């Protein structure tokens, strides 16, 4: 369908690569790129959010840009292996990564992020965990609440 649409004048949009990455369709992404389809940072962030490490790796190897939203996406999706790979390959992160983990509720991922120097805004993490009823994350947060200066 995509090939037919493109061959019949349907213009390329960045979203084509984003949706292919989000849904783990590596062959579609490869075909789209080979035929001139543009991409941007969202291609990597959506692959990460959905846990498609192979797609993310291919995108990066082939020059797709990424930013801190890639780590945030992996965090929200609860994909520790994806987050570890992104960080090992130079992807930036910030306090939003920990907020994303609290939103997604993966305690192991939150512990790994904090142990590896990811900044956080404790109150925001608590609010995300509470809003999404992640009791194990809340318990860990309360045990690890920063002391007031």
Predicted regions and their residues:
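Ankyrin repeat (ANK) tandem alpha-helical domains that serve as protein-protein interaction scaffolds
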Residues: 1-149
């Amino acid at each position: 369908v995509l090939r037919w649409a493109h061959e019949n004048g349907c213009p390329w949009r960045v979203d084509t690569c984003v949706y292919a990455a989000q849904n783990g369709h590596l062959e579609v992404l490869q075909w789209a790129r080979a035929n001139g389809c543009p991409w941007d940072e969202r291609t990597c962030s959506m692959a990460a959010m959905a846990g498609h490490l192979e797609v993310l790796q291919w995108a990066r190897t082939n020059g797709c840009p990424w930013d801190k939203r890639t780590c945030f996406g992996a965090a929200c999706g609860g994909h520790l292996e994806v987050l570890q790979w992104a960080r090992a390959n130079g992807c930036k992160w910030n306090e939003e990564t920990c907020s994303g983990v609290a939103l997604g509720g993966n305690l192991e991922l939150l512990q790994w992020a904090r142990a590896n120097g990811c900044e956080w805004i404790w109150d925001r993490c608590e609010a995300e965990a509470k809003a999404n009823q992640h009791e194990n994350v809340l318990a860990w947060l309360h045990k690890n609440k920063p002391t007031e200066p």
